[in-house]
């Protein structure tokens, strides 16, 4: 993973990574906490450059981040835990009101996420926000028009359930995505249930296509 100590390098990576659709997608991670009045302390897994971290801090939450690598967010005062999700102990995750793990699980092998979800549940954190890429059947059509400019967007996903997902060549890339053959939404939700997690809310985003869950322990 690239070192971003140089401000110019950081700006280039920031503008490359944070497209409009990705910024809206990351805002939604924070928006799911609206109305959870018992949430003050948040553990964010996989913060990357720290946009969600900064939004959480700005919203008034006490934030700790966790990642396999040292922090890249550059936010003073945000505690960081350097750990592997596949090995982290539940007690390391304990003591928070909410755990956010968005767009991270797909970077692990499919069979490895059962144990990670079980660790989340065993931590006794009362609220969890989880999202993973969703490529199941969906249609997104939109049009913007005024007297000076117009733009349109259209996406139609329909037959991915017939195909196997092709993992990225990058070993740190995606190992799977929901909606492909062998990785259905029902399969993923069965893993959540097996870990002892209850779905309180499920939602979908586009054009960064993901399925989001607000989860709780029964």
Could you tell me what each predicted segment is?
Residues 1-98, 114-117, 123, 173-217:
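Conserved N-terminal segment of class I S-adenosyl-L-methionine
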Residues 10-11, 102, 131-135:
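Short loop/turn segments at strand-loop or loop-helix junctions that form parts
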């Amino acid at each position: 993973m690239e070192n971003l100590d140089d401000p110019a390098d950081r700006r280039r990576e920031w503008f490359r990574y944070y497209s409009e659709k990705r910024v809206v997608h990351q805002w939604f991670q924070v928006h799911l906490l609206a109305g959870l009045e018992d949430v003050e302390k948040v553990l964010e897994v996989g913060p990357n450059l720290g946009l969600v971290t900064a939004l959480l801090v700005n919203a008034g939450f006490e934030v700790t981040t966790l990642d396999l690598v040292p922090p890249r967010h550059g936010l003073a005062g945000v505690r960081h835990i350097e750990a592997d999700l596949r090995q982290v102990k539940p007690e390391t995750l304990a003591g928070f009101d909410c755990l956010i793990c968005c767009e991270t699980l797909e970077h692990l092998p499919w069979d490895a996420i059962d144990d990670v979800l079980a660790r989340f549940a065993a931590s006794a954190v009362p609220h969890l926000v989880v999202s993973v890429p969703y490529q199941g059947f969906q249609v997104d059509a939109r049009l913007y028009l005024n007297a000076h400019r117009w733009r349109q967007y259209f996406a139609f996903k329909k037959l991915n359930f017939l195909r196997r997902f092709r993992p990225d060549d990058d070993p740190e890339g995606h190992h799977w995505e929901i909606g492909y053959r062998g990785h259905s939404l029902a399969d993923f939700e069965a893993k959540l249930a097996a870990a002892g997690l209850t779905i309180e809310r499920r939602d979908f985003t586009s054009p960064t296509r993901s399925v989001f869950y607000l989860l709780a322990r029964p």
